[in-house]
């Protein structure tokens, strides 16, 4: 999906015009079960590294390709609240979290509150979107399409609901069931955060929130 569009980027160095092909290779890393804060810190580190490469390229005659990373993992039980989210959507006191073995983080992605836990595949694309396309709306729709195609490969009919971000099973019925949530951040066209795909998660943890 991300390799379908091909384009050249142009950069000026002194009086010369440099034309180079963007890097569409993606480095995949499976982190396994890992605490949320560790992956958040790793995302920030990879994003900062990519930003440094992009900044250095402005002043170099030879352009270094910017990397693209895709991190897969599961998390111990955790709730995360996006920067525009409403904390009242956490339907319990923070002091109650330890009784259900969960933690809570306010983070810098878009979207509201969501849950991560064992049995849920979480994906964090740390992409330089200038390697693909500079359109956040298209980026989200492309991530959704990847999940829809994955569901289809397992015999599940999934799709979108107009006006909403996410992927649902029985999306055209009166009772659609959300199977994948999305929340991203982009800075200098570098993405972080991503999607949460419910494969075999304990859905009872969603009863403690008003999910996004």
Predicted features along the sequence, with ranges:
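Short hydrophobic targeting helices and cationic amphipathic motifs
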Residues: 3, 8-9, 17
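N-terminal lobe of the biotin/lipoate ligase/transferase fold
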Residues: 19-176
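Catalytic cores of processing enzymes, dominated by hydrolases/peptidases
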Residues: 177-212
């Amino acid at each position: 999906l991300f390799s379908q569009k091909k384009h050249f980027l142009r950069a000026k160095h002194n009086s010369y015009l440099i034309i180079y092909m963007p890097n569409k290779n993606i480095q995949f890393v499976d982190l396994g079960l890992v605490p949320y804060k560790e992956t958040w810190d790793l995302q920030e580190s990879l994003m900062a590294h990519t930003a440094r490469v992009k900044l250095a390229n402005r002043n170099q005659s030879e352009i270094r390709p910017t990397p693209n990373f895709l991190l897969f993992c599961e998390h111990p039980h955790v709730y995360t609240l996006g920067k525009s989210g409403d904390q009242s959507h956490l339907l319990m006191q923070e002091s109650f979290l330890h009784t259900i073995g969960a933690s809570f983080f306010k983070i810098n992605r878009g979207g509201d509150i969501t849950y991560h836990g064992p049995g849920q595949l979480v994906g964090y694309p740390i992409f330089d979107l200038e390697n693909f396309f500079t359109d956040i709306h298209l980026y989200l729709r492309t991530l959704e399409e990847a999940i829809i195609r994955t569901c289809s490969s397992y015999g599940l009919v999934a799709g979108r609901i107009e006006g909403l971000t996410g992927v649902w099973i029985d999306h055209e019925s009166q009772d659609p069931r959300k199977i994948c949530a999305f929340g991203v951040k982009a800075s200098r066209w570098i993405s972080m955060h991503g999607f949460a795909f419910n494969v075999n998660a304990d859905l009872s943890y969603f009863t403690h929130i008003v999910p996004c």
